[in-house]
């Protein structure tokens, strides 16, 4: 392992009925609150009324930013920054999934920065201060509820970056599985693809002596693979929703990658795709990840083989390690497809036309690190993976 320091100050409040904890949690930060949410599903399922009721009963003055996009955009962040400054906001509360939380992180950091907020999100500068914020999670997927990272898209320039800082951890996150009951099947699938991808990207590294971390990765993956088909048959099953909700948090709260840094090439490539084509993030991952695996397989065949044997039932008799690994990759792609995820860029009507642009965007992100830590990739490599994904 490499030396490491683990820091995660987020208070995780998990379980049925835990929304009541909001009463005491937000008040220590102030009563002038900006409520941030997405397209309105929290109004349809009653969560909006519950949250605003609690806030107002506890004396909060509630302002709102609604309409956060699935790939949150700079323009929406800037609108939120303006609201915070106009109303002298003390505290932000994100009610939604990863996109809402990512947008809230960006607003919280942007308010405290005197320059162009895009400087932070494009990693020209690091956020050194942020307004306090908490989350009420409604979707198991990104892990943003318990990490400092955020992804913001600049639609004007076709740029999309992952950024983060020690000041952008949520102060608390409330996770009640019942708040995920109304998540539709396709979004449930995307969430599970996303969390599995997070685990893969932490697993693929070149650091020696990480047996415990490897086994923790296997445990999360095995749990999602076992639970996913059952959940899709019973979307309001509390125990199944509970399991997936917790898996999504563990997949990206830093627990799995203590002592090394993984390879985030697939996420970087997908961010480039969805910076040009406004597609679901996890849909892009389901397409790209198996092809990244096939492309980088020879870097460490044994590591691929070990992963696949810990996920799927594969008959190894008479097969080479590479054949076993390739069969596992095929099984992964088939598993995601069986859940309803896409398998080709053509499923989103994406062809050859803008692959050069996408590869250029991905190559620019390489400059910021986190790209190719398992196998170094260049623009030509990215193009090859994209073309294999058509």
From Swiss-Prot:
The keyword Oxidoreductase applies. This is Probable NADH-dependent butanol dehydrogenase 2. Keywords: NAD, Oxidoreductase. It is an enzyme of class 1 (oxidoreductase). It comes from Bacillus subtilis (strain 168). Its EC number is 1.1.1.-. It comes from the Bacteria. Pathway: Alcohol metabolism; butanol biosynthesis. Gene3D superfamilies: 3.40.50.1970, Dehydroquinate synthase-like - alpha domain. The gene is yugK.
